[in-house]
Amino acid sequence: MSGNDLTNDRVQAHETLIGVGNVATLKPAWTFKTLGSVSATPLVTGGYVYFPDWGGGLHKLNARTGQVAWSRKVSEYTGWRDSVSRTTPVLSDGILVVGQQPQSFGAKHDSSYLPGPETGDFLWKVMLDQHPATIQSQSPVVYNGVIYIGTSSNEEHWALDTKFQCCSFVASMAAVELKTGRVIWQTPMVPKGYTGGAIWSSTPAVDPKRGVVYITTGNNYTTPPEVAECGERQARLPACQ
């Protein structure tokens, strides 16, 4: 998974070969021509590398040789021409979980979709938000048969169009059943009357002992009028919090 494990520590404790003394001497073992730039952290497991690119591709390569096991377009799974993924896939119980987003203005919404890792064949997809600006930029995590993933938005970019009526998107965090795609729960990230609160970064951290999922949010768009008015009167004072 993107953060290495459930704690999202991003530490490879078993890596002993690469260090400050030899990193400058490293040379490519193999290369692979993608359909676009790659910004997602690759998933490396079972001798294979899984990753998406900004050209709309999703790939599985042999980690040692770079040989292509399979390479698909994200649009094959979603049915939407401009679909891309910027999230690190996660593999659990023989199922590959990937989040996606549209590239074009006014395109379709977010969804999580699941290819089978051996062939890349489609299994199921789930749409977590009907808002047209919704995307998924957070990489999912799977624990105990449940996918944890949040929603983000392109609405602040859409607002560059002066004709666009911003803002109405409300972010949420969801728990989805891995085998079926059934949404177990979904929680909004901002109180009623607010908009924004996108979950756009990294991967959730899961604490199995406490039964808690840790996430970060950002990009608040709007606040209720009474809160905004209070803020103007009492700028930076606790009275408005």
Where do the model's predicted regions map?
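Surface-exposed loop and turn segments in beta-propeller and other repeat-based domains
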Residues: K73-W80, V126-H131, V183-G197
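Short clusters of small/polar residues that mark proteolytic maturation junctions
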Residues: K33, N62-T65, K73, M127, ...
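Short, glycine/acidic-enriched capping/hinge loops at junctions between secondary-structure elements
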Residues: R10-H14, G55, N62-A63, E226
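Beta-propeller domains
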Residues: I18-G21, D53-A69, K73-V74
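Repeat-blade elements of multi-bladed beta-propeller folds
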Residues: M1-L6, L35-G57, W80-S112, P132-Q165, ...
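Short loop/turn segments that connect beta-strands within beta-propeller blades
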Residues: V23-A24, N62-T65, G116-T119, E177-T180
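Blade/loop signatures of beta-propeller domains
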Residues: M1-P28
